[in-house]
Amino acid sequence: MHSFDEVHPLQMPTALETGTLNVHGLAGLCAGVRWLLEQGVESLAARENALARLFYEQVRTAPGVTVYGDMTMQPRAPIVALNIGQEDSARVADILWEDYGICVRAGAHCAPLMHKALGTAEQGVVRFSFSHFNTEQEVQQAAQAVCALARELLCE
């Protein structure tokens, strides 16, 4: 061992490695990939997109709610982006978390040119992302929260 040498080793793979290898991280990555392969990527995607469609169908006609994106496009990510009236997306996200315990992402999502194209550069959007681990009940609760919040905010 040459732990205290002032020159980094030149031989491979040591030249590319510093410190102790992240063995726990590698084991977790291996287990995660194994689980994905066992479940089937297509099966997981179908479930996630079904949850996103369920949410979309429940919020798309709610007064004051604007949903962005085409849910018929395939393949697509299980994401629904929306706004409530002219409310700032960060305010909507804060209320969803504080009052309903629903975690979403608000803002420009590192896509400023898309927001310019959508006309949401100032407001941003509220992004709901669904995963295999969400339940239909959670999706319905999120949709009910959006509808209730829209009624509340539009009456202010």
Descriptions of predicted regions:
Residues 1-156:
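Pyridoxal 5′-phosphate
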